[in-house]
Amino acid sequence: MKGPRAGDDTVATREVTILNELGLHARPAAEFARRARAFRADVWIVKEGQRFSAASLIEILRANLDRGARAVLEARGRDAEAALERLARLLQELKD
């Protein structure tokens, strides 16, 4: 790892289910990516064995997170636990 997230190898994971009626489409995905970039941690979405950067709108859209989709949020870095707590909560609260 490099950049501001380096120096702490704390790893956290959390299972999530997408509840938003329209899934994680462009608008909520952009908000999710913006918030993921705010942490001192690298955050990924793992779905069906594939890893997608949670900091990238394009990667989130590639994950095809429709309503009811299950995935794992994975974070590594100083803010790993806080990142997953807040991002999982965001997924619960997202409305179109």
What is the meaning of each model-derived region?
Residues 1-15:
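SAM-dependent methyltransferases
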Residues 2-6, 30, 55, 85-86:
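Long, contiguous binding/interaction regions
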Residues 15-17, 74:
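Generic structural detector for well-ordered beta-strands
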Residues 17-67:
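Compact, glycine-rich, soluble single-domain proteins
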Residues 62-96:
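C-terminal structural segments of small proteins and small subunits
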